[in-house]
Structures are given as structure tokens and as C-alpha cells.
């Protein structure tokens, strides 16, 4: 563990309540696990996981005031539900207070609550890790989501987004349009991947069929040759038997 990670952990342990700190460690751990599975940078994944909730120690009113003071853009959905602002404010703290200048990490932190269109690998890793980390127990369909996350990250993202939207609709909670747009975009990604896989499978079947047909075409002339040779051998054998019978008669 390098010095940067140690310093971040030390700071967060002081600033976050015990529950939030344990959640943070769980997300960082899961980010690393997903990064190993999908061959992504483990260090960047861990930092994103550690800092994703660094601003969640503030109440909604404080976050709203801090975002206004720092001129952080806020959507209508975030104004209706200021709890969402911890993502954008967290990205600001990650940059200004923790010295993170990697834009990919900052963007992943900024969109980890709502998602966004055109999500990067790190965006998806953090989004999914936040939902499935070991300390979670109330989220819907957790066992299935945890398994799916290590099989198909895009499909896991889509499934989580759909589950969250379904929950928000059923409880009449405000829905940020960013999440709706992110879900629609991820659905297109998943459908495009399925179409490509089906096309590849059909191509493979077609190639196998062509190879089999070619082998049959090659085998047919050989069968004809063998048939002719067999007829010739049978003819010779028959003539030999006739000559033998004639000699015995004489």
C-alpha cells in the first residue's frame, strides 16, 4: 500500500462516520476486484473507491450551499434531491483537497450515483462496486448482481440502473433524468453487444457448414473412384473364376 492510499485512508477515517468508512473500504475493495477481472488499473480503481463518498459527511443543506459557493453546476434532479450532490462535491474535494488530477477518476466519482451516457470502464466499475460491495444487504437482487458483475459488467450496470429506477418509481421518489439517460444508453450498449455476438455466432455456423460441404464434395469423387476400382476388381475375379472352371472341365 503506497503513501497516497495510506494518507487518504487516514483522512477518511477521521472525517467519515464508522458506517460510511466501512462502506468506503468495501467499495474500494470491490473496485480492485472488478479491476482485476476486467484488466483495469488497480491503483486508480482503489482511489476512486476510497474517495467516492468523501463528501457524504455533510447534510443536504450544507452540500447545497457548498456547491453554490463553488459554482458547481446542479441539475433539477439534484436540486430536488440534494443528497445526490455528494457525488459532484466529492469530485471537487478529490481534486482540491486530496490532489487527484486524473480526470477519469474525478469523472467516475462525479457520476457514481446517477451514472451517465458513454460510461468509461472506471465509471462502470465504481458504479457497480458501490451497489454490490460486501457491506450491502438491502439492495434488490444482490446475489444475482454480485455474480453478474464478474461475468458482464455492462449488463450488470444496466440491471442495477433498471432496478434503481424501478424502486424510485414504486416509492414515488424523484428521478434524475441523468439516470434515465444513462440507463437508455447502457441498454443500447448491451443490445449492440448481443447483436454482435449473435452475428459472430451465425458467421461461425456458416463457416462450419461451408467446411463440411467442402469436405463432402472432396469425399464424393473418392467414393466414385473406389466404386470403379471395386467393379474392376470384381470383374477380374469373375473372369478368373470362369477360366478356372474351364480348366477343370478339360
Regions found by a protein language model. Give the residues of each.
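A short, charge-rich alpha-helical start-of-domain segment used by transcription regulators
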Residues: 18-20
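Divalent metal-dependent catalytic cores for phosphoryl transfer on phosphate-bearing substrates
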Residues: 7-14, 37-159
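Charged phosphate-binding loop/patch that engages nucleotide di/tri-phosphates or the phosphate backbone
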Residues: 167-211, 215, 224, 228
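Long, low-complexity, intrinsically disordered segments
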Residues: 214, 219-250
Amino acid at each position: 500500500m503506497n503513501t497516497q492510499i495510506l494518507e487518504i485512508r487516514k483522512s477518511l477515517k477521521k472525517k467519515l462516520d464508522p458506517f460510511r468508512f466501512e462502506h468506503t473500504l468495501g467499495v474500494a475493495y470491490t473496485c480492485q476486484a472488478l479491476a482485476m477481472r476486467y484488466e483495469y488499473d488497480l491503483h486508480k480503481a482503489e482511489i476512486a473507491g476510497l474517495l467516492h463518498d468523501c463528501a457524504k459527511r455533510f447534510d443536504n443543506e450544507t452540500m447545497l450551499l457548498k456547491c453554490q459557493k463553488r459554482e458547481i453546476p446542479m441539475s433539477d434532479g439534484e436540486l430536488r434531491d440534494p443528497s445526490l450532490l455528494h457525488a459532484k462535491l466529492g469530485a471537487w474535494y478529490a481534486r482540491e483537497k486530496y490532489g487527484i488530477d486524473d480526470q477519469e477518476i474525478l469523472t467516475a466519482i462525479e457520476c457514481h450515483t446517477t451514472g451517465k451516457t458513454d460510461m468509461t470502464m472506471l465509471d462502470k466499475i465504481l458504479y457497480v462496486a458501490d451497489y454490490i460491495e460486501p457491506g450491502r444487504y438491502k439492495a434488490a437482487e444482490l446475489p444475482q448482481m454480485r455474480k453478474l458483475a464478474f461475468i458482464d459488467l455492462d449488463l450488470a450496470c444496466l440491471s442495477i440502473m433498471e432496478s434503481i429506477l424501478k424502486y424510485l418509481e414504486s416509492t414515488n421518489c424523484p428521478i434524475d433524468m441523468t439516470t434515465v439517460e444513462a440507463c437508455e444508453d447502457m441498454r443500447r450498449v448491451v443490445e449492440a453487444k448481443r447483436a454482435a455476438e449473435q452475428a459472430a455466432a451465425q458467421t461461425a455456423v456458416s463457416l462450419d457448414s461451408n467446411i463440411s460441404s467442402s469436405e463432402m464434395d472432396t469425399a464424393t469423387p473418392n467414393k466414385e473412384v473406389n466404386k470403379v476400382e471395386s467393379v474392376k476388381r470384381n470383374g477380374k475375379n469373375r473372369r478368373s473364376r470362369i477360366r478356372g472352371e474351364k480348366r477343370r472341365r478339360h
